[in-house]
Amino acid sequence: KCAIHSQAGSILHIPREGGYLCRVYVDLGVVPEDDNHKVRNTPIEKIIEKANEIYAPYFVDVKMVAWHSVYEVGHRLVDAFDDNDDDPRVFLTGDACHTHSAKAGQGMNVSMQDGFNIGWKLGHVLDGRAPKELLSTYHGERQPAAQNLINFDREWSTLMATPTEELDDPEAVEKYYVAAEEFAAGMMTQYEDNLIVGTTQHQDLATGFPVGKRFKSFEVLRRCDAYPQHLGHQHTADGRYRIYAFADAPKAGETSKLSEWAEKVGPILAKFTPEGADENTYFDVKAIYQQTDHHEYEILDAPLLFRPRNGKFNIPNWENVFNALPGDKDIFHTRGISRDGAVVIVRPDQYVGAVLPLDDPAAVEDYFSSALIKLT
């Protein structure tokens, strides 16, 4: 996107598909209190005229307007995203919950996150894998996220509407946008402790994966074919939890915390898995070894937990074992992962649910005992 700020006002450009379309937000200025919404009837010719005042001494010769509208910025937030704290039956998402300006480009992004959040939770409850209490986490997670968006948008839209001569710093708009880049990218939301968000007690084991925030991906090397992959890109929207087991120093085939953890966690996960279903039906468990040379061990040396058998023909999945890359691409270094190992549980919506020690497999059962229903 491109933000233009001049003495005549501000404009926000967002390029569109096809190579010739462009969405343009034109600030029409302060609306008088007695306007009675007449500004909403502003003709397109007046909008183009105002745009060129802002562009001056440059101008744009508009060839075609595919669609336009005029709206007044209103910052509003509902009191609740559901109808009942104990047993909710009605859920609100998106614009039904929060309204704000379009200048941050966050409306659709945040609304889709609302929908994804309640969507996977409904799916888990309706198919019997999670307790109905899971639904109560929707309001607790998304209402504060919407409030943070409105706070951000109020500050951003006010800054964009402030005449340049009134700004303390002529580069204030640019500096604020750069500083808020991570928020605009959707990576700043952080959920508080609840049924599916653990405490930060062991956060020091993986400082680059903050509990309650989006899983921030990084490249690793897939062992089966020595192909570099972004770890987070293996997380498809299939309703499963991801469990990333970052190994301690020994390589696969040697006695280690990871091998002992895998031996004990396999039976734990089986307690939540339907009888007769593939062992990775509800969980996708991946190992990431510290060794940067994939020739140092054979994939068959990795514990069976990371080589689950799937489908009608009981075929092993070879794509769950990874190595760190060398040098400054080492995920252990870049994401602050302890060389003693760590376990990172990621929810179906790609938010980090827990960071746990590798030498405490029982902590995995504790986490999922709240998130899921034990079947055996």
Tell what function each PLM region has.
Residues K1-V73:
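Conserved FAD-binding catalytic core of PHBH/FMO-like flavoproteins
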Residues P15-E17, V31-E33, E49-I54, D86, ...:
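Helical substrate-recognition/capping region of FAD-dependent monooxygenase/halogenase enzymes
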Residues L21-R23, D86-R89, G94, H98, ...:
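Short, cationic motifs built from Arg/Lys/His that form the positively charged side of catalytic pockets
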Residues Y25-D27, H68, T93, F246, ...:
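Generic beta-strand/beta-sheet core signal
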Residues V26-V30, A96-C97, K103, A247, ...:
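Short, histidine-centered active-site or binding-site loop motifs used for metal coordination
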Residues R40-Q106, V110, A145, L149-D153, ...:
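FAD/FMN-dependent oxidoreductases across multiple families
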Residues V65, D95, G115-I118, Y138:
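Structural scaffold positions in well-ordered secondary structure
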Residues C97, M108-G123:
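Functional cores that coordinate and move charged inorganic groups
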